[in-house]
Amino acid sequence: MPEASSPFPDGIVLGFDVGTRRIGVAVGSALGAGARAVAVIDVHGVAVDWNALDRVKRNWLPVGLVVGDPLTLEGHDQPIRKQAHAFACQLRERYRLPVVLVDERSSSVEAASRFAGARAAGYKRRRDADTLDAIAAAVILERWLADPMQATSLP
């Protein structure tokens, strides 16, 4: 749960998992510990579908934004990291909300495990696999909710 020194006031927070073709979006409350997948936004080349993202923002009215910081498992830089940081800066400029970066190592593995569990229980089908990006965003957001002080602020 966010502490007094968190960059966000209490309220709704959106989390993002940035990929080369899609951006997963999740929602959570700064007062709680859970998050849920809500959307997958298409990326065309390097252009984000901002109209779709604007609708998500209008629907949820977040007080802050959490973007996954895609380091390698060893903690090194990788090409997608530059895109994720650029997206985080674009979010801050466009929405004038606080944005933080959260280490997303292994979030895709955890998301795949959650999806497999939901599929085995009959809640998801193979065609729902594109929701994996949104599930990964929920994992990232839950990490921030559990420990907001581990986040990195944008420069």
Curated annotation (Swiss-Prot):
Keyword rRNA processing on entry: no
Keywords: Cytoplasm, Hydrolase, Nuclease, Ribosome biogenesis
Record GO terms (molecular function): nuclease activity
Protein name (Swiss-Prot/TrEMBL): Putative pre-16S rRNA nuclease
Lineage: Bacteria, Pseudomonadati, Pseudomonadota, Gammaproteobacteria, Lysobacterales
InterPro entries, sorted: RNaseH-like_sf, YqgF, YqgF/RNaseH-like_dom, YqgF/RNaseH-like_dom_sf
Gene Ontology BP term (one): rRNA 5'-end processing
NCBIfam families recorded: RNAse_H_YqgF
Family membership noted in the UniProt record: Belongs to the YqgF nuclease family.
EC category: hydrolase
Main localization of the protein described in the UniProt heading: cytoplasm
Compartments (UniProt record): Cytoplasm
